[in-house]
Amino acid sequence: MRILCTNDDGIHAPGLKIVEQIARQLSDDVWVVAPELDQSGVSHSLSLNDPLRLREIGPRHFAVRGTPTDCVIMGARHILGDKGPDLVLSGVNKGRNVAEDVVYSGTIAGALEGSILGFPSFALSQEFSMDNKGTPLWETALAHGPAILRKIIDQGVPKNTVININFPACAPGDVVGVRVTRQGKRNQGFLRVDERRDGRGNPYFWIGFERIAVVDTPAEGTDLAALAAGYVSVTPLRLDRTDDVFSQVLNTTLG
């Protein structure tokens, strides 16, 4: 089995080394194609106005000056040639990718692009706690990832479906279990725009999230609830985002 690994945190990110270690427990034919620079939050963007620069940094390890989507395309269509990968793994992301994160995430996008190209694809993310100074416990993803992947691969992943796996912010032995979840909904009141001034007094801005305690109880069955309870969250995501229920309403309204 040929595995293509990518991420959005960049070619030198610790999580990329973890996903490669996970991949090597599944196969010895592992290729890494990742962004040269941090591409967090770029979503499914594709470089159309700038050329892509490809740099081989080691055997089967390549850096692309582009987005995670660019990396998967370069890996599947150029570096690996006609055969392409049998599996795409994107991650392991530093921080969870749940709820609305999936819209912004370059990690999710890497897996989505793999699925679009016809390959079974997984996004993997490691939640971290500020109690641990924001350092993820990578060993949790490494300990639990391979077995979860094997079971899902043996089951088979439907076409046009991506598997989003999030590991909780706890030690491997403290993981309660695995839950199949749906995408949750977060309180976006935490989103903020931080205005600052440069040396000339001109304004510039950062978009971020308030580091405050979460008071909302996540809905049962969601990715948010699973992580809060110490479970690994496994969420199947579909490429087809059509709202079939509201489509029926619109048919009545517009018919």
UniProtKB/Swiss-Prot annotation:
A cellular component term, taken from the record's GO annotations: cytoplasm
Entry-linked InterPro entries: SurE (IPR030048), SurE-like_Pase/nucleotidase (IPR002828), SurE-like_sf (IPR036523)
Cofactor, how bound (note): Binds 1 divalent metal cation per subunit.
Pfam families (alphabetical): SurE (PF01975)
Annotated localization: Cytoplasm
Cofactors demanded by this protein: a divalent metal cation
Keyword Hydrolase: yes
Keywords of the record: Cytoplasm, Hydrolase, Metal-binding, Nucleotide-binding
Statement: the UniProt record of this protein carries the keyword Cytoplasm: yes
Catalytic activity from the UniProt record: a ribonucleoside 5'-phosphate + H2O = a ribonucleoside + phosphate
Family: Belongs to the SurE nucleotidase family.
Stored HAMAP family: SurE
PANTHER family: 5'-NUCLEOTIDASE SURE (PTHR30457), 5'_3'-NUCLEOTIDASE SURE (PTHR30457:SF12)
Role description: Nucleotidase that shows phosphatase activity on nucleoside 5'-monophosphates.
Protein name: 5'-nucleotidase SurE
Record organism: Rhodopseudomonas palustris (strain BisB18)
